[in-house]
């Protein structure tokens, strides 16, 4: 787990990570269209606005809010995250959709999906064994 966190820290510090930014930062035109169409991080001031075809999800212990395209909910990796959520919080949870996953891991997953890359094996293992 420590090795994964170290790797995620390097990804977070790299230039590639800049493709996925919070709403408070100015994204490039290329990443801006992706952020609008699949996942964005919203500031607390913008919590009420969810674009049509998107779903708000809260990630990690920090309850970081992301707005995710509903199309991503059918992706096998996202289904794995939803299954982890069901195991952690139960199916009858009321209120917001929570993903029990570290924010950096979630961002890495979304970045892989955005780039059309397979989700890295170490992340798939984390989803599968419930240690995210």
Curated annotation (Swiss-Prot):
Listed GO biological process terms: auxin-activated signaling pathway
Keyword rRNA-binding (UniProt): no
Principal localisation: cytoplasm
Stored InterPro entries: SAUR_fam
Pfam families: Auxin_inducible
Composition-biased stretches (Basic and acidic residues): 23-33
Tissue-level expression: Highly expressed in the steles of roots and hypocotyls.
Region of interest called Disordered, as start-end residue ranges on this chain: 22-54
A Gene Ontology term for the protein's cellular component: cytoplasm
Subcellular location: Cytoplasm
Keyword match Nucleotide-binding: no
Keywords: Auxin signaling pathway, Cytoplasm, Developmental protein, Growth regulation
Function: Provide a mechanistic link between auxin and plasma membrane H(+)-ATPases (PM H(+)-ATPases, e.g. AHA1 and AHA2), and triggers PM H(+)-ATPases activity by promoting phosphorylation of their C-terminal autoinhibitory domain as a result of PP2C-D subfamily of type 2C phosphatases inhibition, thus leading to the acidification of the apoplast and the facilitation of solutes and water uptake to drive cell expansion. Plays a role in the regulation of cell expansion, root meristem patterning and auxin transport.
Family to which the UniProt record says this protein belongs: Belongs to the ARG7 family.
UniProt subunit comment: Interacts with and inhibits PP2C-D subfamily of type 2C phosphatases such as PP2C67/PP2C-D1.
PANTHER family: AUXIN-INDUCED PROTEIN-LIKE-RELATED (PTHR31374), AUXIN-RESPONSIVE PROTEIN SAUR72 (PTHR31374:SF198)
Name of the molecule in the record: Auxin-responsive protein SAUR72
Biological source species: Arabidopsis thaliana (Mouse-ear cress)
């Amino acid at each position: 787990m420590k090795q994964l966190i170290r790797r995620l820290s390097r990804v977070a510090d790299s230039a590639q990570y800049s493709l996925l930014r919070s709403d408070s930062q100015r994204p490039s035109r290329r990443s801006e269209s992706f952020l609008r169409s699949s996942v964005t991080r919203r500031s607390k001031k913008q919590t009420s606005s969810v674009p049509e075809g998107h779903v708000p999800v809260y990630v990690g212990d920090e309850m970081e809010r992301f707005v995710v395209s509903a199309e991503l909910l059918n992706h096998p990796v996202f289904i794995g995250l939803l299954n982890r959520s069901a195991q952690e919080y139960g199916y009858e949870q009321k209120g917001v959709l929570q993903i029990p996953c570290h924010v950096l891991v979630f961002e890495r997953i979304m970045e892989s999906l955005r780039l059309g890359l397979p989700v890295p094996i170490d992340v798939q293992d984390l989803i599968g064994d419930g240690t995210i």
